[in-house]
Amino acid sequence: MPTSYMKLPYEDRVLRPEALRSYDLETGPVGYSLDIGLNYYRGLPLSAVESLELTVDAEPVPEHLILVELNGKLFPTSQLSAAFTEFWPIKKDLRIYVFNGGIEDGPHQVDLRLILRCVYMQFAPGVWGMIDNSASRTLTLQGER
Amino acid sequence: MNIDGIEQGISLYSFNREFVTLPDYTIEDALDDLVALDVQQYELVGSVFFEHYPRPDPAEVERVLAASEVRGVTPFSYGGYMDVGRITGHDPGPQDYILDLTADLRTARELGCRYLRETNIPIDLLPMAAEFADYYGVNIGIEVHAPSKPSDRHIQEQLEAFERIGSERLGFIPDFGCFIERPAAPALDRHIAAGADPELLEYIIANRHSGLTEDQMHQRIREMGGGEAERVAIAEFFGFLSFGPADLDGFTTLLDRTHYFHSKFYYVTEELEDPTIPMPALLSAIVDSGFQGVLMSEYEGHAFQDSDAPLQLARHLRLEQQILSGSAKQHEIRSR
């Protein structure tokens, strides 16, 4: 059988210390954003995202509260698989917005499960190499950019 | 350096850790590192260095050309990919391959590269690929990469297809990662640091070619008390760090159809020895074949150790020079 889940040693750049930021409007807190880096050696099409699950402080974040931003465009997680003309370059972060009304200041335990399809590594019809881009980290909420 | 018609180049993939992990490290920095090693020919991998892929923005191509010109270096080859799995749930067909090949040929041409590296082109599309290579004036090399080996049936079938088609545009790029005889110590150290049991790692290495599949090996190691750290090691040893007796006979069958080489390496000691890849045997086969062209050093130790790419590349270039000078003399003596 082929290599199943590849995990490269760039995990530290998936959730950087300053990745978690509050997202406020003049009307008040709207939610927060989270920047996600690639743990791979090259960029990938956005459609390579096979699954993206976010858990903050042990609470899974509901899918309908999440929007993903890349190249100035927003996608619900359910549409990422269709975004095959968007390229996620290796030096650029994916930004996730969570519209939950905000979270408290201070540290938060962030667990990201992100599986990517290795789009050039096909082992059999419908069977592709997979990249484990998951990471866990305690992140302190930062102010807005 | 050029030794009797074999020129040393460097794949910028060698600086992958720097490029990926250092926010301020740019293509210009990679080219500076290349120049510091006194090397002029290089390979650029589009999906690493460009923000847009499969087709880079024209300004990105312009930037590479300008940075190269000012440093007196040349993009010799362009590293392309067949990203045919980009459409989720779609079984790729000829159109998907042709799209990616065309995109990469266009970029290679714009960069002035003589060669395009491709990861895979189905055999029935090779005649069309040769035609497209003529249109764009760029030669296409299919990389022979671990876990494949030159003697593998699908590689030999490609070789037969190249012969049948008869176009000089088509050839191979053998990657020396195919000839890993044993994982390098730093690769093992990384797994041990992650919690893998050294004895279980030795068991995996000793039984890698016992006929067990990756899943069966995983199952057995679990029964022996192994966990996640061993699973990651197994995935690596059955994948890109696949190892075994070097397929030198298979290697020689490809040499007449080789465009250039990816002189892949993971670790060169201070004494200028590569404990993983049989460099003297590989390079002397190349010299004996009469090959004239580029030997592209490609450091991949960054996959498992903190990188010192410039130091490792400097050692690797010297190691190649030593072997090539010796092999060239031997070859001359044998040819008399």
Which stretches of residues belong to each language-model region?
Chain A
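Terminal leader/tail segments of proteins
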Residues: 1-145
